[in-house]
């Protein structure tokens, strides 16, 4: 009899433990990943900005659409690297993307449309490796070489 109660409580506990709803940053990541899986994408794209920016007060359920900008990186989509570890490609393609969001059974359904925005000026943030190299350059010792000499002929 006791084992029946334990089994019943375990089943009810499993039913009540539903997965957490999808967050806004997770929806942005999934949207960029789905764009990178398109066959025409040569180099992977990375999130450049989002409107609104991800933050504590932004909830996916209150948004009707995702609006974000992505930029081409130096990595290929087939590389198994996280896109955040890839540096932006110099003079890479920039795309403005938007699309309505509907959440069905904790899975976002996004009809994504992207347009070329490469002509718009943008400040490019380097990846982790680029930031590491910049820090090394900042702290390296300054070396000055001075060459002095004289020559006498005959």
Swiss-Prot record:
Organism placement in taxonomy: Eukaryota, Metazoa, Chordata, Craniata, Vertebrata
GO CC terms of this entry: extracellular space
PANTHER family documented for this protein: CATHELICIDIN, CATHELICIDIN B1-RELATED
Claim: Transmembrane is one of the keywords in the record: no
Tissue specificity comment: Detected in trachea, lung, proventriculus, duodenum, jejunum, ileum, caeca, colon, caecal tonsil, bursa of Fabricius, kidney, ovary, testis, thymus, liver, spleen, bone marrow, skin, uropygial gland, muscle and brain.
SUPFAM superfamilies in the cross-refs: Cystatin/monellin (SSF54403)
Protein name: Cathelicidin-2
UniProtKB keywords: Antibiotic, Antimicrobial, Disulfide bond, Immunity, Innate immunity, Secreted, Signal
Gene designation per UniProt: CATHL2
Compartments, record wording: Secreted
